[in-house]
Amino acid sequence: MAKLILATFAVVFLALAATSLAGDPDMLQDVCVADYKSLRGPLRLNGIPCKRLENVTANDFFFDGLTNAGNTTNAVGSLVTAASVERLPGLNTMGVSMARIDYAPWGLSPPHTHPRATEIMFVAEGTLDVGFVTTANKLFTRTVSKGEVFVFPRGLVHFQRNSGNTSALAIAAFNSQLPGTQSIADTLFGAAPPLPSDTLARAFQVDGGMVESIKSKFPPKY
């Protein structure tokens, strides 16, 4: 656990060092702890309104959700535990967040994007095959081992796969309080309302029956 904590601090330091290129607007006050109660009303804005300073406590800046391994018993064999503004209100306006990613043996983080942030990933345990694809369809990929770091540029499709017979663990940092995640398969085949099957069939050059079969594996998430 001590090694994990040190690794976490290292990743956060690297993320903070890049705040001049943060994906979020600059903050205009010392702190702006997210006031979740305000989200119940009709007001919506690019961020979350601040809690009154007299109501802010140290717990608003604390999160222990990364201490335990995530349950990787699922179809892809991985689980992301995010420490974003949705779980850590003190991150509001800070322009950073992080996540813990647990991988079962041969587990996969399927191709996805973070539309609002660059990701820097530190491998704490195991070995991962990782990569991203540029807008020119060029793939950059390599194997990343324990103690090594890899960067995924903002908005580009990328993946990670555990290439070993044992569990793996990675810690990721983002230059946004809420980087967002779009899984390519979920987005295309599990949208609500669904994308037209003939559109997907023509895009992937397959028949409609195959599209419907794939859609059945990705129920819409509302």
UniProtKB/Swiss-Prot annotation:
Gene Ontology, cellular component aspect: apoplast; plasmodesma
Name of the featured protein: Putative germin-like protein 3-2
Species, as recorded: Oryza sativa subsp. japonica (Rice)
Lineage, highest ranks first: Eukaryota, Viridiplantae, Streptophyta, Embryophyta, Tracheophyta
SUPFAM superfamilies on file: RmlC-like cupins
UniProt KW keywords: Apoplast, Disulfide bond, Glycoprotein, Manganese, Metal-binding, Secreted, Signal
Disulphide bonds in the chain: C32-C50
Xref: Pfam families: Cupin_1 (PF00190)
GO molecular function, one term: manganese ion binding
Residue numbers binding Mn(2+): H112, H114, E119, H158
Leader sequence segment: 1-22
Cupin type-1 domain: residues covered: 64-212
Similarity section: Belongs to the germin family.
